[in-house]
Structures are given as C-alpha cells and as structure tokens.
Regions:
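G-domain G4 guanine-recognition motif of GTPases
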Residues: 10, 143-144, 169-182, 203-210
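Charged helix-capping and loop-helix junction motifs
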Residues: 99-103, 183-190
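P-loop/Walker-type NTP enzyme "switch/lid" segment
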Residues: 39-111, 212-216
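Conserved C-terminal guanine-recognition region of P-loop GTPase G domains, centered on the G4
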Residues: 149-164
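Inter-motif core of Ras-like GTPase G domains
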Residues: 111, 125-146
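NTP-binding/hydrolysis catalytic cores, primarily Walker-type P-loop NTPases
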Residues: 216-260
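Walker A/P-loop NTP-binding active-site region of P-loop NTPases
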Residues: 4-69, 115
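Beta-strand-loop-alpha "switch" segments that mediate conformational coupling across diverse proteins
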Residues: 177, 192-220, 232
C-alpha cells in the first residue's frame, strides 16, 4: 500500500507545483511508482510543467464522476515510465471535485502506486480542504519572506487541528538565497522553522537553472548542473525514509557561476 502526500502552501507563487513535479519525478527515478494529481481546478499547470498538456484528454473530476477510469485519464510520462500525471480540470468549478469521491480515487491509487502526490491549490478554501481530505502526509512549501511564512504557519495549524488523517507535516523552504539570508536581508532556515514549527524536509536554493529548464520543458532533477535539482532529489529520498544531510550551499557557486 502506497501513501498520499499533499504538497501545499497557503500563499500562492511559492513554487509548489515545481516542487511537486520535481520531487515526484525524483521518486520515480529511484524506482517508485508515482501518480501526480493536480487539484488546482481552473488554474492547472502541472500538465504543462510535465510536458503532457497535449496528451491530457481527461482530468481528475472526470475520474471522480466516472466519466472515465484512472487508467484512461492518467498520462504516463514518456521519459519516466514509473511516473503518471492526472491533470486538474481547466473549465469546471472547484466545488465539483467531491472530497469523498476524491478520497476514493486516492485510496484506489494507493493500491497501485507507491506515492500519490497531490498538488494543492493555494489558499485555505474548498480546494485546500478537498486536497487534504485523503492525505497521509503533508509537505508545506514556503519561501523566505514574512507573508509566505505566516501563511505556512497558518496552514500547519489548520492541518494539525482539522485533519487528523495527516500523520506527518514537514516544511520545504524554497528559493533560499544564502547570501541574503546570511546578511539578514531575508529570512533564513532557522527563522522559517521558528515561524512554522514543523519538521524540515529540505531546503531548495534559488537556482537560475529552474527557469532555464522550465523554458526548455525540462525538469531540474534531470539537470546535473542544478543545485535545486539535487535538493529535490534529496527531498524525495527523505520522503522515502532515507536519511540524507542538507546540501551545503556555497554562495560563490550559487551567485558567481555562469550558467550555459
């Protein structure tokens, strides 16, 4: 039996979908069968990041409403055969994704996949609650600014009090710039952990390769030059129970290296 992990944030624009795509791909690269589910109804992006937007004929609501089954809707990655993507609907209303039926879908998927990763909508409204309803674990993504960290803390509190099905909550600090955090110009990992107060699963450094890779329809976990890609791989390993130390972030390497 696999497990369902929701990737959430509270604040939008923190890189939640990028984390979902890269961590899911990294899990598939170590031999795990992975299903990525986009629940951001009306604003789906996971299919585009994964390069399957032209192949996505059905969506998660089609499966919950029995228009088609999971086999017919989930798109297998051409490059990573253990990885499947189930897109969100671009045209339906968020409330049309019924949480009980969505849980049934996730419970069935766990029988066939090692990991079901749910890309959760931003905010704490209906879509958030629906995505959390079937989850076994949660990863909260934040960036080192006060608004994002406050929202992440709020999300952690809601999960702890309202979703007893979620047995573990962990924090992913995304887009950290060591040069700025060490100078006190932005928050660092210690301040983020103090604010959110959940276990850390990983720190992803700011990395120009993410933009370059996305523009070329690539994933950073498949780019050997990408420090962020290495961080995503490490997060995947920790999610799978492997103890790996945090990356040592070399400021000179991050900010003076030329990217070709």
């Amino acid at each position: 039996m696999g497990k369902t992990v929701v990737i959430t944030s509270g604040k939008g624009g923190v890189g939640k979908t990028t984390v979902t795509a890269n961590v899911g791909t990294a899990l598939s690269m170590i031999g795990k069968r992975v299903l990525l589910i986009d629940t951001d109804t009306g604003l789906r992006n996971l299919d585009m990041i994964m390069g399957i937007e032209d192949k996505a004929l059905y969506n998660v609501i089609d499966v919950t409403e029995k228009t088609c089954n999971l086999d017919g809707a989930a798109v297998q990655s051409a490059r990573f055969p253990n990885l499947y993507i189930l897109p969100a609907s671009q045209t339906r209303d968020k409330e049309e994704l019924n949480e009980e039926k969505f849980k049934e879908l996730c419970d069935e998927a766990k029988k066939r996949f090692d990991y079901v990763l749910i890309d959760c909508p931003a905010g704490i409204e209906y879509g958030f609650h629906c995505a959390l309803y079937p989850a076994d674990e949660a990863v909260i993504v934040t960036v080192p600014d006060k608004a994002a960290m406050r929202d992440a803390d709020r999300v952690a509190g809601i999960i702890e009090t309202q979703f007893k099905n979620v047995k573990e909550i962990r924090l992913c600090i995304n887009r950290l710039i060591p040069e700025l955090s060490d100078s006190g110009l932005t928050a660092g990992s210690a301040e983020a952990l103090f604010t959110v107060a959940v276990k850390l699963i990983g720190i992803v450094p700011e990395d120009p390769n993410i933009l370059i890779d996305a523009y070329n329809s690539e994933l950073s976990v498949n780019n050997r030059r990408s420090l962020a890609g290495r961080a995503f791989k490490n997060i995947a390993c920790r999610l799978d129970g492997i103890d790996i130390k945090l990356l040592k972030l070399n400021k000179r390497r991050l900010f003076k290296k030329r990217y070709r």
